Structure formats: C-alpha cells, structure tokens
UniProtKB/Swiss-Prot annotation:
The gene is tusD. It is an enzyme of class 2 (transferase). GO terms for biological process: tRNA wobble position uridine thiolation. The keyword Cytoplasm applies. The active site is at 81 (cysteine persulfide intermediate). GO terms for cellular component: cytosol; sulfurtransferase complex. This is Sulfurtransferase TusD homolog. It is found in: Cytoplasm. InterPro entries: DsrEFH-like, Sulphur_relay_DsrE/F-like, Sulphur_relay_TusD/DsrE. GO terms for molecular function: sulfur carrier activity; sulfurtransferase activity.
Length: 131
C-alpha cells in the first residue's frame, strides 16, 4: 500500500483537554505505519502548544518537546495560526519586533502561518485530521 500524506489540525491546548496529546500519539502512529506527516497546524487554543513558556511537572510528559522531536526527526512542519497565536500571547520573534514587544515565546521548530497554509494542506495532502 502506498503511504498517505497527512496534515493534522490541533484545536486544543497542551493542558485541559486530551486533543493535543491524542494528536501527538496519532502522529507517532502514522509515522510508525510508514505514512508521511507533512505538517501540524495549531489553531484556536491549539496555538498554546507552540509556547515555550510551559513548564510541565517532572513526572509529566513534555508535549512541547514531543512535538519538537517529531519536527526534527521527521521534517514535520509545526505551524501556529498567526492571528490565533497573537490573540493568545504566543508571539514569534518577527511578530514581537513588528509590534514593538520586548520578548517572544514561540518555541523552536514552530512557525507562524496564516489560514492559507491550512488551505494549501487541504489541497495537497491525502488526509487532513482534526483534533
């Protein structure tokens, strides 16, 4: 069977719901089965997954590091919706500079993108799965 290409859409934050964790586990399973995960688009409260300022307890899985490892190991694009991110205080270095902010908190391996990026994924990937 030919491997399928996927994009995941994550609407839930790291904490408070299981959607982000389930998306991560699904992403790992896809890759283990030989499919290709092209990107993960974080939307609505899901953009909070891209914040570098979360500090989980020592005995908890660090979901941010999990996403970053996935991006590094499998060339997965991690994209936060720029509009949703700015509204929730997740700011890239470029956006911080543009808006005159003293600091930024978008985690390494995450980028900010518009909804056009998600629309492109809808056209190009074999499957888009929302969490």
């Amino acid at each position: 069977m030919k491997p399928l290409t996927y994009t995941l859409v994550v609407n839930g934050p790291q904490y408070g719901t299981q959607s982000a964790r389930n998306a991560y586990l699904f992403a790992k399973a896809l890759i283990e089965k030989g499919h290709i995960l092209k990107s993960v688009f974080f939307y609505q409260d899901g953009v909070l997954n891209g914040s570098s300022t979360h500090v989980p307890a020592n005995d908890e899985f660090n979901l941010l590091q999990g996403w970053q490892s996935l991006a590094q190991s499998h060339q997965v694009q991690l994209e936060t919706c720029v509009a949703a991110a700015l509204r929730r205080g997740v700011v890239s270095e470029q956006e911080a500079s543009q808006h005159g902010l003293a600091s930024h908190n978008l985690a390494a391996h995450f980028t900010q993108a518009g909804l056009g990026s998600l629309a492109q994924a809808l056209l190009e990937q074999d499957r888009v799965v929302q969490f």
